[in-house]
Amino acid sequence: MKKISLFVLCAVLPISGWAADGAKLDLNVRRIGLEWSKTDVKNADKYADSPVSALNADSQDFIKGIFDTALQYKKNRFQWDNALFMEYGETKLKPDDEPETVSENADDILLSTDLSYACWEFSGFKLGPTVRGAYDTEFKAAGDAPRQNILRSNAGISLFDNAIIKSLYLTGVYEYDFTYAGEQTSKLAAELGWRLEYQVREGVKLSTNGYYREYLSYSEYVPTDLERDLSAVVRLDTNLWGDLTMGPYIQYRRARARGVDVYGSNFVMGISFNYITSFGLIK
């Protein structure tokens, strides 16, 4: 938690110093909610030692909690997003005359800061360079695998701040992975990521976000390191009352590790109940 607190403090203090310059500062609650889901996992036995919980989970029903917020600062051509994403899902099974079993289906904490600059503006689009830093970890270890710990930096080009295309980027990636004690590795990759929103009609919004990451080189050989990683979410949110929404969603994760010759996948579909809003802190 000390790492998370330090990251948040470093992100917020510079923003507070610039706020007096007439810039815009918003706290976007992308969603805080619960998801009921049915999960179908393939080749989980091949990924039993992977630190990625989504690839070694059990196929079953579960309930998951989501917390996704972003502090967004805009001034002239600059946009600076500081985001915190957390999710956790766990199912407890207790068959008759058998001990209780616990299966972790989702576990992720992602702290990120993203700075983009609009070199060109046209037809409601902004295009320019983007840089990003992130710390990716978990609440606890998945089974016998260690708790994931990754520092990640991105640099590339981004299309952003559009009514539909909130973010669409192509970047190079550097990762420092210290998940395994004594086996710290550095990795280079290419990443395509997106966050899109479409207002179907009043009170109904379709949204999707995700990424595809292709790893290109590694400093060390670790069998559980991923070669390819795809993650995508699609949601349809319908307003129930005020800022409370409900709707179906689909989530898909597909990846392949260096030491495995088949892909692991995690397909989730279910119903999502969310609180979504935005607070204008500085206008």
Task: Write out the residue ranges for each language-model feature.
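Outer-membrane beta-barrel transmembrane domain signature
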Residues: S167, T171-N239
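Hydrophobic h-region of N-terminal signal peptides that target proteins for export
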Residues: C10-W18
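Hydrophobic, lipid-facing positions within transmembrane beta-strands of outer-membrane proteins
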Residues: I63-T69, I109-T113, N149-A155, L188-W194, ...
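Predominantly the C-terminal beta-signal and adjacent terminal strand-loop region
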Residues: D225-K283
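Outer-membrane pore/translocation modules
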Residues: K92-G193
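Transmembrane beta-strands of outer-membrane beta-barrel pores
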Residues: R31-K42, K75, M86-K92, G133-F139, ...
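Short loop/turn motifs that connect adjacent beta-strands in outer-membrane beta-barrel proteins
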Residues: A20-D26, Q72-D81, A118-G128, F160-Y169, ...
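Surface-exposed strand-loop-strand hairpins of Gram-negative outer-membrane beta-barrel proteins
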Residues: E35-K64, K94-T101
